[in-house]
Amino acid sequence: MGEDKKTARETVEEEPLSPCSRLFNSPDFNCAIIVTMGSKVKGDTPAIIHGLEHTLVNHPRFSSILEMNNGKKPRWVRTKVKVEEHVIVPDVDPDIENPDQYLEDYISKLTTIPMDLSKPLWEMHLLGVKTSNAESYAILKIHHSLGDGMSLMSLLLACTRKTSDPEALPTVAVHKKRFGPSCNSGFFNKIWWLFVGLWFILRLLFNTFVDILMFALTIFVLRDTETPLLAKPGSELIPKRFVHRIISFDDVKLVKNAMKMTVNDVLLGVTQAGLSRYLSRKYDQEATPKSKESMRRIRLRSAIMINLRPNAGIEALADMMAKKSKCRWGNLFGYILLPFSVGLETDPLEYVRQAKATIDRKKHSLEAVFSMAFFKLILKVLGLKASVVLVRKVIHSTTLSFSNVVGPKEEITFHGHPLNYISPCVFGHPHALTLHFQTYANKVIISVTADPTVIPDPHKMCDDLVESLKMIKAAVLERGLYEIEV
């Protein structure tokens, strides 16, 4: 009986790393996530520490250390957490000359400091510096092995409350899909849906076959065109620069409604337009008109990580932290290779149309599921090193990482601090450019993570993205595609 209790206790206190978490812990693919939260009020360190003690540290991953004994697989081992050891409050001159630059430099420096393996792999930096966007900052640094971006963002939101209602959790938009006939459909309608279903399956199989072929070619021979955005060898070791811009979510939704598309379609269209503007200017500066003329022949792709585990949801995570109950968690993802169309368009709306066509095709493919299964097979048969080589090869052969994270519909408060914006980013992977779009209330935060040796002007990249949205919005209004609701 005593042995049974001991075994049960060890099962609860120890858990092996998932294959994806092992990948993120490998020396050649050591990734971490940084979430910058800009507060509307001055920072209150004791209030944040008290809040973390009752929320974040109750999550098993945030109260476990990574144990890597020789001869054994890495495991998560529960430990007692002293929150004060994870909260860092640097001395900042309140009259600092350029606070915005100080914030950028501080976050960039965080990419050079490895995580302390003797503690749970997270830390929070509290900066009492007033910038053009916030009165103070909380910067959360999390090792990527703790979870995927969507899960970690949901967990962070579960630690917050609505500013308008301090007892209520944030609400996040959920896109509900409906496919197939209703129960009351007629006979001919059901026959029609049968043919639609068969066509869907055939298209799914064909697209998956093509994507698997392109994925295999990317691993062995196919690489993106050499451009001013493509990473150099060792780019993952270079301290990154993090810059952001805040745009209106209403502008994005205006384009979305006018063109009957999704928010993701619009943001990818904005990205295509922004990258085209940036590359066009670069080629002009380098006086290589031939390169500019051949922009449409450029192969430029993004390796996008797709979470294959159903999100636990903010309510479930909040309940787990409050009651210390269990909840599904972990890294389970696959990759898709998303091509971008690069070139200066006379019609700005063409960027969005092209983006929608590309995304719609990718939605009818099992590329992400295949890539995840292939990675797990390589890990099982050839080991971790071979898996890391595989993933690095895919990323090295593409140009950028891209993500769009859905945030709360309303403004939120983080342990007594109403937030003006949230800006996530990731580093440690061998891309010179990573783009994140984060929605928050009526805003969209564009975050650019750049290797300064490849992209020395990330602020201009941000400006190009902002100007691209303005250009697309102006085209919508000029053509009267959007009707103002009364």
From Swiss-Prot:
Its EC number is 2.3.1.20, 2.3.1.75. GO terms for biological process: petal development; petal morphogenesis; triglyceride biosynthetic process. Disruption phenotype: Disturbed petal development during their growth through the narrow space between sepals and anthers, leading to stuck petals in the bud during elongation, and resulting in the formation of folded petals in the open flower. Flattened conical-shaped petal epidermal cells associated with abnormal contacts of petals with the sepal surface. InterPro entries: CAT-like_dom_sf, O-acyltransferase_WSD1-like, O-acyltransferase_WSD1_C, O-acyltransferase_WSD1_N. The keyword ATP-binding does not apply. Pathway: Glycerolipid metabolism; triacylglycerol biosynthesis; Lipid metabolism. It catalyses: an acyl-CoA + a 1,2-diacyl-sn-glycerol = a triacyl-sn-glycerol + CoA; a long chain fatty alcohol + a fatty acyl-CoA = a wax ester + CoA. It is a single-pass membrane protein. Bifunctional wax ester synthase/diacylglycerol acyltransferase. Involved in cuticular wax biosynthesis. Required for petals development, probably by mediating the production of fatty acids at the plasma membrane in the petal epidermis acting as lubricants that makes petal elongation smooth in narrow space between the sepals and the anthers inside floral buds. This is Wax ester synthase/diacylglycerol acyltransferase 11. It comes from Arabidopsis thaliana.
